[in-house]
């Protein structure tokens, strides 16, 4: 149960870092794709 209680403290910063990184990467690729055409 201790691992289950400690899971949110690891999972929340991970999601907080991963989701903006994916959003930034997709936005960057979208801009790069628009520059080529």
Swiss-Prot record:
Keywords: Chloroplast, Membrane, Photosynthesis, Photosystem I, Plastid, Thylakoid, Transmembrane, Transmembrane helix. It is a single-pass membrane protein. It is found in: Plastid, Chloroplast thylakoid membrane. The keyword Lyase does not apply. The keyword Nucleotidyltransferase does not apply. The chain crosses the membrane at residues 9-29. Disulfide bonds: none annotated. Signal peptide: none annotated. GO terms for biological process: photosynthesis. GO terms for cellular component: chloroplast thylakoid membrane; photosystem I. May help in the organization of the PsaL subunit. This is Photosystem I reaction center subunit VIII. Belongs to the PsaI family. Its main location: plastid. InterPro entries: PSI_PsaI, PSI_PsaI_sf. The lineage of its organism: Eukaryota, Viridiplantae, Streptophyta, Embryophyta, Tracheophyta.
């Amino acid at each position: 149960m201790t691992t289950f209680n400690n899971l949110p403290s690891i999972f929340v910063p991970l999601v907080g870092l991963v989701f903006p990184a994916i959003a930034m990467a997709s936005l960057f690729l979208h801009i790069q794709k628009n520059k080529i055409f």
